Swiss-Prot record:
GO terms for molecular function: protein folding chaperone; zinc ion binding. The gene is ZNF259. This is Zinc finger protein ZPR1. Keywords: Cell projection, Cytoplasm, Differentiation, Metal-binding, mRNA processing, mRNA splicing, Nucleus, Repeat, Zinc, Zinc-finger. A zinc finger (C4-type) spans 51-83, 259-291. Component of an import snRNP complex composed of KPNB1, SNUPN, SMN1 and ZNF259. Interacts (via C-terminal region) with SMN1 (via C-terminal region); the interaction occurs after treatment with serum. Interacts with elongation factor 1-alpha EEF1A1; the interaction occurs in a epidermal growth factor (EGF)-dependent manner. Interacts (via zinc fingers) with EGFR (via C-terminal cytoplasmic kinase domain); the interaction is negatively regulated in response to epidermal growth factor (EGF) stimulation and EGFR kinase activity. May also bind to the PDGFR receptor. One of its GO terms (biological process) is DNA replication. Pfam families: jr-ZPR1, Zn_ribbon_ZPR1. It is found in: Nucleus; Cytoplasm; Nucleus, Nucleolus; Cytoplasm, Perinuclear region.
Length: 459
């Protein structure tokens, strides 16, 4: 059953009028401030707007903010003092991500209903057990909870029921039965599955067990189809042909992009690098002159390997922290002693040292907004402090631990200081990928031979 009509009542929030109340300066180089209840300078911009309910002037408040560990968003709230109508929504202010994202959550307990959810306009929400779907662009973006998503769908289905009962009583009865099923889900009498599929990659579902792995939540990153690219207003660019005499291995290429920290225009340098005893990779480094943020990312310069690679390294000495490390986008990281797992695509591709990778993990976990401030619980804070202490002990060489890199594409690498001899503390395994791993890499439907057959004849 589709919930195309499951939209909150009312028309779009407002039609902006020319007059606007002045807002405080968010600070040099930072248009989007991190969301914080303690930041007194973070004030909304007030704009006098036309109320689409009574056609008199109301007030729209816009707050440009950034959720740490996530994206920039615009929170808007409209209220009309004349008729009392109000409306709130959020919009993603960040860039469309390189890949789409699919969150599959198995709801087993009432605690799962309280998970924070960021759902953008382009996200599709499904509950397979009820054959229920909220299509993309049928609802405004929302910062809510799992229970809030279901309540919003119920409200959308109930809003036209009086009219249906008068004109189509049979249809209204079926919708009443379906609404009752949705209300039963809120009681979590039995487990059900919630899927949020966002081609833009800007939706988010909270992991309340961070920094530990969430067994109830599966996050899948995927490449968009041409139809999804068109739906998002993106235009695929054809790859440029490279002249035969051109050799870019000794050149540093430059192109314009946006800073991932402040979203200001920045310049990215790109170069092909040959890693000893491994393969060729592409290193991209961005330096923002506006806010001073620096970042680097690594892309594989070759194809997907025939076999996946799992590298298990036993950290026994502080000198191990200096080993070079290449983590591709398809590589997951696990530290069993900390019960910690870093999924694919998190942190992106990186060419750093083992010490740099562990510090990035610590920064990633400690800046999780749902473990900070008023939204955190004492138990979460204690777990986070214990995790940080153990990670510091590993960095200082006090605590021995295993560092596992699992890359189904086989494009990750950890330096062997004994090369070409074997490293006694490192185990490298090559394995055959599963069907699901090939599906995630887009290999199952790839046709490399005989693809010319079946194509329409050219005139």
């Amino acid at each position: 059953m589709s919930a195309g009509g499951a939209v909150e009542p009312g028309l779009p929030a407002a039609a902006a009028a020319p007059s606007a109340a002045p807002a405080r300066d968010p600070g040099p180089g930072h248009l989007f401030r991190p969301i914080s209840a303690e930041d007194e300078e973070q004030q909304p911009t007030e704009i006098e707007s036309l109320c689409m309910n009574c056609y008199r002037n109301g007030m729209t408040r816009l707050l440009l903010t950034k959720i740490p560990f996530f994206r920039e968003i615009i929170v808007s709230s409209f209220s009309c003092e004349h008729c009392g109508w109000n409306n709130t929504e959020i919009q993603s202010a960040g860039r469309i991500q390189d890949q789409g994202v699919r969150y599959t959550l198995t709801v087993r307990a009432q605690e799962d209903m309280d998970r924070e959810v960021v759902k953008t306009d382009s996200a599709t929400t499904r509950i397979p057990e009820l054959d229920f779907e909220i299509p993309a662009f049928s609802q405004k973006g929302a910062l809510t909870t799992v229970e809030g998503l279901i309540s919003r769908a119920i409200s959308g289905l109930e809003q036209d029921q009086p009219t249906r009962r008068a004109n189509e009583e049979a249809v209204a009865e079926r919708i009443d039965e379906f609404i009752a099923k949705l209300k039963e889900l809120k009681q979590v009498a039995s487990p059900f599955t919630l899927i949020i599929d966002d081609p833009s990659g800007n939706s988010f579902v909270e992991n309340p067990h961070a920094p530990r792995k969430d067994d109830a939540l599966v996050i899948t990153h995927y490449n968009r189809t041409l139809q999804q690219e068109e739906m998002l207003g993106l235009q695929a660019e054809a790859p440029e042909e490279k002249p035969e005499e051109e050799d870019i291995r000794n050149e540093v290429l430059q192109f314009n992009t946006n800073c991932p920290e402040c979203n200001a225009p920045a310049q990215t340098n790109m170069k092909l690098v040959q890693i000893p005893h491994f393969k060729e990779v592409i290193i991209m480094a961005t330096n923002c002159e506006n806010c001073g943020h620096r970042t680097n990312e690594v892309k594989s310069g070759g194809a997907v390997e025939p076999l996946g690679t799992r590298i298990t390294f036993h950290i026994t000495d502080p000198s191990d922290m200096t080993r070079d490390l290449l983590k591709s986008e398809t590589c997951s990281v696990e530290i069993p002693e900390l019960e910690f797992e870093l999924g694919m695509a998190v942190l992106g591709g990186k060419f750093t040292t083992l010490e740099g990778m562990l510090k990035d993990i610590r920064e990633l976990v400690t800046k999780n907004p749902f473990t900070l401030g008023d939204s955190s619980s004492p138990g979460q804070t204690e777990k986070l402090q214990e995790f940080s202490q153990k990670l510091d002990q590993i960095l200082e060489g006090i605590l021995k631990a295993h560092f596992i890199m699992d890359d189904p594409a086989g494009n990750s690498y950890l330096q062997n200081v004994y090369a070409p001899e074997d490293d006694p503390e490192m185990k490298v395994e090559h394995y055959k990928r599963t069907f699901d791993q090939n599906e995630e890499l887009g290999l199952n439907d790839m046709k490399t031979e005989g693809y010319e057959t079946g194509l329409p004849a050219q005139r």
